[in-house]
UniProtKB/Swiss-Prot annotation:
Cofactor(s) the record lists: (R)-lipoate
HAMAP family: GcvH
GO biological process, one term: glycine decarboxylation via glycine cleavage system
Lineage: Bacteria, Pseudomonadati, Pseudomonadota, Gammaproteobacteria, Alteromonadales
UniProt KW S-adenosyl-L-methionine keyword: no
Family named by the database record: Belongs to the GcvH family.
Positions bearing N6-lipoyllysine: K65
The protein, known as: Glycine cleavage system H protein
Key words, A-Z: Lipoyl
Keyword Ribonucleoprotein: no
Length: 129
């Protein structure tokens, strides 16, 4: 069974977000998603300054098995990207909720966070797959 930290919020498309002290949100993919994808070989990230819209694809994770679109869980401006993934995409596999984060977003509508799933709700999504 995948690790699903209770302090994070989740999208049914297998992304997680964590609120940071500056009001931004860090975005990554869940441990469950990286297990399904397998060993990461390349991650394409949005650019700092890009505007992302909740539910729209904004990044790509390529593994030995497949390429998968990554969707923005919330709308806002990308304020940082995890440049370490350029040389070490395997960080997504080894530390999905830590060093394997994808990008940070300053939200344009923080109420979108309320529409995301808690850990229990995300577990229910996995159970239905």
């Amino acid at each position: 069974m995948s690790n699903i930290p209770t302090e994070l919020k989740y999208a049914s498309s297998h992304e997680w977000i964590r609120k940071e002290e500056d009001g931004s949100y860090t975005v990554g993919i869940t441990e469950h998603a990286q297990e399904l994808l397998g060993d990461m070989v390349f991650v394409e990230l949005p650019e700092v300054g890009d505007t992302v819209t909740a539910g729209d694809d904004c990044a790509v994770a390529e593994s030995v098995k497949a390429a998968s679109d990554i969707y923005a869980p919330i709308s806002g401006e990308v304020i940082a990207v995890n440049e370490a993934l350029e040389d070490s995409p395997e960080l997504v596999n080894s530390d999905a909720y830590g060093e394997g984060w994808f990008f940070r977003v300053m939200p344009s509508d923080e109420t979108e966070v309320d529409a995301l799933l808690d850990a229990e709700g995300y577990q229910a999504v996995i159970d239905e797959e």
